[in-house]
Amino acid sequence: MAIHLVIIDALNLIRRVHSAQPNQDDIQAVVTTTGRTINRILKETEPTHIIAVFDHHLQDRGWRAEVLPKYKEDRKPMPEALQKGMDAIQESWWKLGIDSLLSDGDEADDLVATLANKVASRNEQVTIVSTDKGYCQLLSPTLRIRDYFQHRWLDEPFIEKEFGLKPEQLADYWGLAGISSSKITGIPGIGPKAALEILTQFPTIEAANESDELPKKYRKKFDEYYNTAILCRKVAGLRTDIELGFNLQDIRYEKPE
């Protein structure tokens, strides 16, 4: 039997549902709405295996903040009402046949990346349900990303249209241009257009730095901020070596009776 693993970026989904509620203290409405959303995802994707991955609730920003101290330093804490309602949300999803994986100090995206990469590398189908374009660096013939809210696939044609690059160049792109919302600086003075120009000419940051053909207008910036770009790329990248502590059989989807 062919495997189709669906991984739900849980807080990505829950926060969007919660922010759309007229009364954001009404957690039962969030439970009900996310339940309907999960049922639609199940119908659309028809998984053989499924899991929802949750970030830990702590303000600990994980290993990325050790590399870049300003990383997500202004991240707003989860609203108190929503935090208190997380157990109810997880319980409602469990009743729909979906188990939860809670990170313990690791960011959810690294857990998602590790599991997705592990299964996709065995030529099994994986779908990540998330609006987070960061997952697009994982794209492969057997790994895809579904933006449920925009009803679109974040696939290679999307990346080509959005960034003009290949998925495997995205971390280098963010290493150069930065991600302002996460306080990933990149190289000061190099924005999206310059990053695209550089990565169209060279496959990686290292290749650009080592080449005599790097345009002069960028050479001084590279000389000054090359190490910063490498660190920013590391933080923008995804780890795929997290210890998961379970196997695929543990998350086989069984439709509740």
UniProtKB/Swiss-Prot annotation:
Query: Which SUPFAM superfamilies does this entry report, sorted A to Z?
Result: 5' to 3' exonuclease, C-terminal subdomain (SSF47807), PIN domain-like (SSF88723)
E.C. code? 3.1.-.-
Cofactor(s) in the UniProt record = Mg(2+); K(+)
Free-text cofactor note? Binds 2 Mg(2+) per subunit. Only one magnesium ion has a direct interaction with the protein, the other interactions are indirect. Binds 1 K(+) per subunit. The potassium ion strongly increases the affinity for DNA.
Domain (5'-3' exonuclease): residue spans on this chain? 165-255
Alphabetically ordered keywords of this record: DNA-binding, Endonuclease, Hydrolase, Magnesium, Metal-binding, Nuclease, Potassium
Top-level taxon in the UniProt lineage: Bacteria
Q: Name one GO biological process term.
A: DNA replication, Okazaki fragment processing
Alphabetized InterPro entries for the sequence: 5-3_exonucl_a-hlix_arch_N, 5-3_exonuclease, 5-3_exonuclease_C_sf, DNA_polI_H3TH, FEN, HhH2, PIN-like_dom_sf, Xni
Q: Where is this region: Interaction with DNA?
A: 189-194
Binding site residues for Mg(2+): D109
Name the family the entry cites.
Answer: Belongs to the Xni family.
Q: What does this protein do?
A: Has flap endonuclease activity. During DNA replication, flap endonucleases cleave the 5'-overhanging flap structure that is generated by displacement synthesis when DNA polymerase encounters the 5'-end of a downstream Okazaki fragment.
Q: Which NCBIfam families match?
A: PRK09482.1
* This protein's name: Flap endonuclease Xni
Give the organism the record lists. Aliivibrio salmonicida (strain LFI1238)
**Gene name in the database record:** xni
